[in-house]
């Protein structure tokens, strides 16, 4: 008995027909065909040259208000505590 003889394929075919049914299997194949057509259409649309969009001017940033010194006397600038080499 060889592997994948004609009888094996017939049994597999009957099981597929029983599980999916005649109409359901053809519907699935139709959906696959629609997907392939849609994919091909999308690929052909990408090949068409597109005109680059006009560059928009960059928005100017508004000047920020100057930093006011902090009036809190407890605050001091950070000290560098790294060891000197």
Swiss-Prot record:
Its main location: membrane. Belongs to the TatA/E family. Gene3D superfamilies: 1.20.5.3310. Pfam families: TatA_B_E. Part of the twin-arginine translocation (Tat) system that transports large folded proteins containing a characteristic twin-arginine motif in their signal peptide across membranes. TatA could form the protein-conducting channel of the Tat system. Keywords: Cell inner membrane, Cell membrane, Membrane, Protein transport, Translocation, Transmembrane, Transmembrane helix, Transport. It is a single-pass membrane protein. It comes from Rhizorhabdus wittichii (strain DSM 6014 / CCUG 31198 / JCM 15750 / NBRC 105917 / EY 4224 / RW1) (Sphingomonas wittichii). This is Sec-independent protein translocase protein TatA. NCBIfam families: PRK00720.1 (NF001940), tatAE (TIGR01411). Residues 39-85 are annotated as: Disordered. It is found in: Cell inner membrane. One of its GO terms (biological process) is protein transport by the Tat complex. Signal peptide: none annotated. Coiled coil: none annotated. The chain crosses the membrane at residues 1-21. The Tat system comprises two distinct complexes: a TatABC complex, containing multiple copies of TatA, TatB and TatC subunits, and a separate TatA complex, containing only TatA subunits. Substrates initially bind to the TatABC complex, which probably triggers association of the separate TatA complex to form the active translocon.
């Amino acid at each position: 008995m060889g592997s994948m003889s004609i009888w094996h394929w017939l049994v597999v075919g009957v099981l597929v027909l029983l599980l999916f049914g005649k109409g359901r299997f053809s519907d699935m194949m139709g959906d696959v065909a629609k997907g392939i057509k849609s994919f091909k259409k999308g690929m052909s649309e990408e090949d068409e040259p597109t005109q680059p969009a006009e560059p928009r001017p960059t928005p100017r940033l508004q000047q920020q208000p100057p930093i006011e010194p902090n009036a809190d006397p407890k605050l001091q600038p950070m000290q560098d505590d790294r060891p000197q080499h």
